[in-house]
Amino acid sequence: MIAEQVGAVGVQDFLAPAARLRGAGTAGLAELSDLEHADRLARMREGSLGSVHSWELVTAVDGPGTRMTVFLAGCPLRCLYCHNPDTLEMRRGEPVEADELLARIRRYRRIFQTTKGGITLSGGEVLMQPAFAGRVLRGAKEMGIHTALDTSGFLGAAATDQMLADTDLVLLDVKSGIPETYRKVTGRALQPTIDFGDRLNERGIEIWVRFVLV
């Protein structure tokens, strides 16, 4: 059901014309804004193309060491205190090739190795684009780079076993542990996040729980 939601809502939203990017931007990444809509849809579903809002190098809270944090566009939640409201709609990202993004990641491999850093896929909600995220994670692991997902966990069912096998760390953003409060804050149910957390625990994946004090 969740995977269907990603396909029916997220991908269709991606077909709209790309708007001007905000944030750090996608400097250095190829822009593919002239792709036909049908081609975008097919390539996004297979994971060779994604909608990227921006990326930046950070050393603060997105995982250990120096990180290249990639913000994907699109999110199913509507949090009252959203930190990145300009990433909510997939149409506000730019179409970016997975291979192009991996080439950019490769350029920072020595920095990641020196600082014990890596890449963090964030958003928006990274699991709105599971095929693209999975391809980037696989490519990063093949380069020996530490990987992290920054996610609400609401779309955790969309994460394949292979994707999780390629993930070293999950930054799990739990908006509230009270179902009623969670729905009030996000407009969605808490249980999918709990289920995803249980799945991560069963697989022994490192988790950093995030909780915002408002």
Regions of interest found by a model, annotated:
Residues 1-72, 78-92, 107-115:
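N-terminal [4Fe-4S]-dependent radical SAM core
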Residues 91, 95, 123-126:
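Short gly/ser-rich anion-binding loops that grip negatively charged ligand groups
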Residues 93-103:
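Short cysteine/histidine-rich metal-coordination sites, predominantly Zn2+-binding motifs
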Residues 6-7, 99, 177:
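Residue-level detector of intrinsically disordered/flexible regions characterized by low predicted structural confidence
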